Amino acid sequence: MSFFSHHPSRSPRIWTDILLRWQGSVIPAIASRVLVCMAFSLGVTLVDGWGYKFSIPIQESIVPSIVLGLLLVFRTNTAYERFWEGRKAWGTMVNTIRNLSRIIWVSVAEPSPQAHQDKIKILHLLVAFAVATKLHLRSQPLNEEIWALLPESGYRKLEDLNNPPLEIAFWISNYLQREYDQNNINAYQLTAMLRLVDTMVDVLGSCERILKTPIPLAYAIHLRQLIFLYCFITPFQIVNTLHWATAFVVGIIAFTVFGIEEIGVEIENPFGHDANDLPLDQICQTMQANLEDLIQLPPWHQISHGD
């Protein structure tokens, strides 16, 4: 399945499958909090049943409810903006690597068989840049995915670096400059290709900015404190009316507000392994498949109007 085709369908069958889906749901993350609120509500109900009556007018919660709702909306929107910015950055990465690989394959002259092999190696380096960026964003060490794309000497050099994608970008730029010095590309082609390399590095920087600029801690703490206060005050407002149904209703309210807040937590860092993160593994695999297809095309001097 392509990474473009995993979106929910409008089919009733698919809708039901998503409704009942556990993987990717926030239920496991919020279940304990919801149960705590329900247990507290049950305690309030028991105390109320013993004759200790509570009376907090429900009208007094209207303003706090609106404020909490606005805070939750802001929290979720901010997290989704980070998620979407990460997706756009990786979309730019895909397009840039496709464009640069196409230009290199078609435009760089091949005066010798070794030059052809060098072009293949540089296309693999383009995919290696994407894979290294993925691993860098996940704080993972280099693995066999990178090993398959690089010569052993290159892999060993990257092992000792804090930012392998930057080193790979340097290698790509160095290759392009060398081809220009050998008159295999002209100045205009060199400039165009170096701009694409710059775009790849810009994407890396954008992703690092998303990763290293979390939601302010004070905001996250205050929002969670407000959510707990809201869920703990609600039983006192409804127990006289709902009695033993209080815990159930509070559970629904807690599930709603904690769930919305947890969605923001899930998607604010879109570069991990979770079901709600970007499918970076699939994106990298797609790029590699695209470049392997490109390598199967005839060399630049054999191409004639698509024949």
From Swiss-Prot:
It comes from the Bacteria. Its main location: membrane. One of its GO terms (cellular component) is plasma membrane. Keywords: Cell membrane, Ion transport, Membrane, Transmembrane, Transmembrane helix, Transport. It is a multi-pass membrane protein. Belongs to the anion channel-forming bestrophin (TC 1.A.46) family. This is Voltage-dependent anion channel-forming protein sll1024. It comes from Synechocystis sp. (strain ATCC 27184 / PCC 6803 / Kazusa).
